[in-house]
Amino acid sequence: MTLIDLANPTRFLALTARVLPWLAAATVILLAIGLYQSALAPDDYQQGATVKIMFIHVPNAWLSMFVWGVMSIASLGTLVWRHPLADVAAKAAAPIGAAFTFLALLTGSLWGRPMWGTYWEWDARLTSVLILFLMYLGLMALWRAVDDPSRAARAAAVLTLVGAINLPIIKFSVDWWNTLHQPASVMRMGGSSLDKSFLIPLLVMAIAFTLLFVTLHLAAMRNEILRRRVRSLQMMQASRMAFSSEMGAGSRQNNASNEVGAA
């Protein structure tokens, strides 16, 4: 099946109906394995047991940026290729991305309290992630505020692509500025600096959370497609009722005119 085939909403619904149960099962299994391995991971010699917040915080932080990247690609599909499902994909991803970003901020604050002595600092990375969260909320508000779906899709696509400039700022903020966050320890030149007892559970949790996003995203896209179909049917029904009312009114006027003429 090609991308052109997936452009057909009916085929997309049929495919995802078959795939989603398997994705959900894989997500649950990997989450269970990851949580079990995270619980068995040793305490850090400096951070103690609080280091285990990392197994939730890092996947959420990674997905907060990944989801915006997915939305940026979908926005290109809206503006350049006019893919029928591009706006559906972007709109369905926004609430999920906002949730991951909120969880990243929340778990980061809980992790930062014992390490930094405070829940919040106007650190470069913290601030840029907060801006990302606000951008998610802004896009969600835009889709709700604009009644015309095509106008909303184009406006959201432009804002998403403009907002993508924040992604490298988040990623490289620890290198460009003096921040409280440590430099990358998993994906870096020369290999990861994490011990395997931390690295393996972290990677399992990252894959599990990514599968969770894919599962939620496909389910949300299905709901959005069905919602738009219902809205389209409601508009068609309203148009038919309005047309029937006009025809009925016109018929009554003609009958009244004929009666007057006969009299």
UniProtKB/Swiss-Prot annotation:
UniProt xrefs under InterPro entries: Cyt_c_assembly, Cyt_c_biogenesis_CcmC, Cyt_c_biogenesis_CcsA/CcmC
Location of the protein in the cell: Cell inner membrane
Transmembrane segments: 19-39, 61-81, 92-112, 126-146, 157-177, 198-218
Annotated keywords: Cell inner membrane, Cell membrane, Cytochrome c-type biogenesis, Membrane, Transmembrane, Transmembrane helix, Transport
One GO cellular component, as annotated: plasma membrane
Highest taxon listed in the record's lineage: Bacteria
Gene Ontology molecular function, alphabetical: heme binding; heme transmembrane transporter activity
Entry-linked Pfam families: Cytochrom_C_asm (PF01578)
Gene Ontology BP term (one): cytochrome complex assembly
Membrane topology: Multi-pass membrane protein
Main location: membrane
Family: Belongs to the CcmC/CycZ/HelC family.
General function of this protein: Required for the export of heme to the periplasm for the biogenesis of c-type cytochromes.
Name this polypeptide is given: Heme exporter protein C
Lineage summary: Bacteria, Pseudomonadati, Pseudomonadota, Alphaproteobacteria, Hyphomicrobiales
